[in-house]
UniProtKB/Swiss-Prot annotation:
GO molecular function: RNA binding
Cited InterPro entries: Capsid_Phlebovir/Tenuivir, Nucleocapsid_Phlebovirus
Compartments reported by the entry: Virion; Host cytoplasm; Host nucleus; Host endoplasmic reticulum-Golgi intermediate compartment
Keyword Repressor found: no
Similarity annotation: Belongs to the phlebovirus nucleocapsid protein family.
Keyword set, alphabetical order: Capsid protein, Helical capsid protein, Host cytoplasm, Host Golgi apparatus, Host nucleus, Ribonucleoprotein, RNA-binding, Viral nucleoprotein, Virion
Protein's recorded name: Nucleoprotein
Amino acid sequence: MSDENYRDIALAFLDESADSGTINAWVNEFAYQGFDPKRIVQLVKERGTAKGRDWKKDVKMMIVLNLVRGNKPEAMMKKMSEKGASIVANLISVYQLKEGNPGRDTITLSRVSAAFVPWTVQALRVLSESLPVSGTTMDAIAGVTYPRAMMHPSFAGIIDLDLPNGAGATIADAHGLFMIEFSKTINPSLRTKQANEVAATFEKPNMAAMSGRFFTREDKKKLLIAVGIIDEDLVLASAVVRSAEKYRAKVGK
């Protein structure tokens, strides 16, 4: 068959059906199955509104749950007051909360914390002594008052790696100091590992979060300033610099 025949075949697709229903169905079938914060915000708002809920209040409750109890809502209900268990049961029902290996349209507590990280970083400052790795513990490890806003994996989502003078990389390393302790706490098999081995378990997810484009660079800058990681001149807080130095020493960077 000649090149011209192949060209005619391709051109004939001009007359092929391109109905929106079929195309949209394919879009859903082929959609990225990883974490999409925009989609999580959309689903939370839609599901909460559909049930007549104060969905913003529910978001805050889900974040607090995630910060202090983890990512398994059904399991945590077994060791909770009757009133607390009832609230969690309602959240599970309304928002179809899941755990484990979620698909694109699955809402988990950790995904809520990550998607709504502007509130998560505020809650961390209030809850620092109720977290799996406490603020006091991190202060002892860092040798300074460790930035509370960094004390959750979701913080990676507001790190701007393109900040001038390597500030973004320094923030990422400072956050890594917490992530080493957090990873060992939630995964006992890592407790006997070297720091660089533990770091290897979270580096890729952290990089994916830092590379996300849900929040603009301007958004990230505003958030980092708001929680005291950088100042208006984009200068790092001294505690961030010290924490990053500790991390680098631990992992041999």
